[in-house]
């Protein structure tokens, strides 16, 4: 409704001014939307922007009111538009429907890759920021109506996997013992690294394994596949606990076996930017890179980047929009990949780079064995959530409290990580993340549960899609913004915008709840406010689910 109304106002402004860009922007505290077109017309018309704004407002106000129900006001150099009663009525009628915020089905095919951690140990706190950013974006794309495939790119032939395979062969480790496979693989990897650090000459064995797997040796391929699968099974369990699922796992080795890597290296070798010495590399100085981009080693084996290029060419041929989520430590290789694909004339991926989330406990290095796994984070957050839930709802059975505590824990983790803009590093704070009274996932869940409780206590009412008074109108207009925010997230690739929106909706609802009697109101006022509570409940539910968070009916 917000977008439809803005589009109608923009069309009227274009008709009146003759300008394609009518400079609509957020209206702030004074309006729902505003136009700054008077500034751009000032030089052409040789008038002050404030005078132009007055003239535009006077000329279009009747048409705007007739077509949209919005009031037009000139305030200084701005043309402000305040949406009216009809707008609020339409918003509420839509907002109580299941699936509110769902966009029209699109034809543009989107592929989104996220997480893609090396299968040499459990996911850690740093990995799950990638996971949560990627999964939230995926949910927003689906909400916006895009056909989407979510992929996990499995590095099943890199040096880390060679070290694991060597470690299993030389240490006799039982990776099929009881326990999560990713943690068992980490034990092997850490111990193998200790041996390699003590005896560096053993690295020749690792190099030999990498050559064998690239040449297609079946025994070595099998030697690599077994620990990779064991580790991925552990990853999938962790991801499922966080409400995350990938549509497809793509294996790096596929692009060696199907010949795509060899083909792309051949293409690259004929480029003017190619540098063939002992290695094959690309001169990317035209893109600001000082060092050449090495793609093939002196021993003839391809590096990870070469397989990654082949993978992205395949994605570009099968999808219309290609999106990757990568940590800031991958910024160099990510931008080198983009430059190379541009030179090749292939589809260039959009990359969401993120800074890392950390805990006060410090290091998360898998190689040294100093890391805090995602499993440990979830378990500790669940323990703390259980304490909070027990303090609030001691009358519930232990099973009920555990169920709520798990949902609250995942909400706390997901929201605390997604609420910060990806480009900014953050420290996960248990106290803030689990605070039911402040800016947290559980706080938004609690607002939803409160709305559910009000409606259950009300029992029956007659839906009334009207909003009167400052509190009701403010809440209705916040509800109206939900579809707009989803569009902004998928356009700008900024999932934190949805987190901010959901928190603000919870804030406005809580203010409304404390200021306006709902259950104690009578007649039409009661019906009106209960309808608004239901619209809020449904919008909070849709927002929470799009954030990957359970919309609990009771907490």
Curated annotation (Swiss-Prot):
A molecular function (GO) held by this record is: arginine-tRNA ligase activity
Q: What keywords sit in the KW lines?
A: Aminoacyl-tRNA synthetase, ATP-binding, Cytoplasm, Ligase, Nucleotide-binding, Protein biosynthesis
Supply one GO BP term.
arginyl-tRNA aminoacylation
Name the predominant localization: cytoplasm
EC supergroup of this enzyme: ligase
Compartments (UniProt record): Cytoplasm
Catalytic activities:
tRNA(Arg) + L-arginine + ATP = L-arginyl-tRNA(Arg) + AMP + diphosphate
GO cellular component, as recorded? cytoplasm
Taxonomically, the superkingdom here is Archaea
Q: Could you say which EC number(s) this protein's record lists? A: 6.1.1.19
Q: Map motif 'HIGH' region onto the chain.
A: 117-127
Which InterPro entries does the protein's record reference? Answer: aa-tRNA-synth_I_CS, Arg-tRNA-ligase, Arg-tRNA-synth_N, Arg-tRNA-synth_N_sf, ArgRS_core, DALR_anticod-bd, Rossmann-like_a/b/a_fold, tRNAsynth_Ia_anticodon-bd
Similarity comment: Belongs to the class-I aminoacyl-tRNA synthetase family.
- Name the chain's protein: Arginine--tRNA ligase
């Amino acid at each position: 409704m917000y977008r439809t109304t803005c589009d109608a106002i923009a069309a009227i402004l274009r008709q009146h001014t003759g300008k394609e860009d009518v400079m609509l922007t957020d209206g702030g505290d004074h309006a729902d939307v505003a136009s700054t077109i008077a500034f751009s017309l000032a030089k052409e018309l040789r008038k002050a922007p404030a005078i132009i704004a007055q003239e535009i407002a006077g000329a279009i106000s009747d048409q705007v009111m007739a077509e949209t129900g919005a009031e037009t006001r000139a305030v200084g150099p701005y043309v402000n538009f305040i949406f009216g009663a009809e707008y609020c009525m339409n918003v509420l009628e839509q907002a109580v429907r299941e699936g509110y915020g769902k966009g029209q089905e699109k034809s543009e095919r989107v592929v989104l890759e996220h997480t893609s951690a090396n299968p040499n140990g459990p996911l850690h706190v740093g990995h799950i920021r990638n996971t949560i950013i990627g999964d939230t974006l995926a949910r927003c794309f689906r909400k916006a109506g895009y056909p989407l495939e979510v992929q996990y790119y499995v590095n099943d032939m890199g040096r880390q996997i060679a070290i694991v395979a060597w470690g299993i062969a030389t240490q006799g480790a039982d990776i099929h013992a009881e326990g999560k496979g990713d943690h068992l693989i980490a034990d092997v990897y850490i111990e193998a690294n200790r041996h390699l650090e003590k005896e560096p000459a053993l690295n020749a064995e690792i190099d030999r394994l990498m050559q064998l797997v690239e040449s297609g040796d079946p025994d070595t391929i099998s030697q690599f596949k077994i620990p990779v699968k064991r580790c991925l099974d552990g990853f999938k369990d962790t991801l499922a606990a966080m409400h995350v699922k990938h549509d497809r796992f793509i294996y790096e080795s596929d692009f060696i076996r199907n010949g795509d890597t060899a083909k792309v290296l051949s293409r690259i070798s004929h480029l003017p930017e190619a540098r063939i010495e002992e290695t094959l590399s690309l001169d990317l100085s035209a893109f600001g890179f000082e060092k050449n981009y090495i793609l093939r080693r002196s021993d003839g084996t391809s590096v990870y980047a070469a397989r990654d290029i082949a993978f992205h060419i395949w994605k570009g041929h099968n999808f219309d929009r290609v999106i990757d989520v990568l940590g800031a430590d991958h910024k160099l290789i990510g931008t080198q990949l983009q430059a190379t694909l541009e030179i090749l004339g292939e589809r260039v991926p959009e990359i969401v780079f993120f800074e890392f989330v950390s805990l006060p406990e410090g290091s998360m290095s898998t190689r040294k064995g100093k890391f805090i796994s995602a499993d440990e984070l979830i378990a500790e957050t669940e323990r703390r959530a259980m304490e909070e839930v027990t303090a609030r709802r001691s009358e519930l059975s232990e099973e009920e409290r555990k169920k709520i505590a798990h949902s609250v824990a995942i909400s706390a983790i997901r929201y605390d990580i997604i609420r910060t803009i990806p480009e900014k590093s953050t420290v996960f704070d248990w106290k803030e993340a689990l605070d039911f009274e402040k800016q947290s996932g559980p706080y938004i869940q609690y607002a939803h549960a409160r709305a559910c409780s009000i409606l259950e206590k009300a029992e029956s009412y007659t839906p009334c899609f009207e909003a009167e008074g400052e509190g009701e109108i403010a809440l209705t207009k916040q509800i109206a913004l939900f579809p707009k925010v989803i569009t902004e997230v998928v356009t700008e690739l900024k999932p934190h915008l949805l987190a901010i929106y959901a928190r603000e909706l919870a804030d406005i609802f809580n203010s409304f709840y404390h200021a306006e009697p709902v259950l104690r109101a009578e007649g039409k006022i009661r019906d009106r406010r209960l309808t608004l509570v239901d619209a809020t409940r449904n919008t909070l539910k849709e927002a929470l689910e799009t954030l990957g968070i359970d919309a609990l009916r009771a907490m």
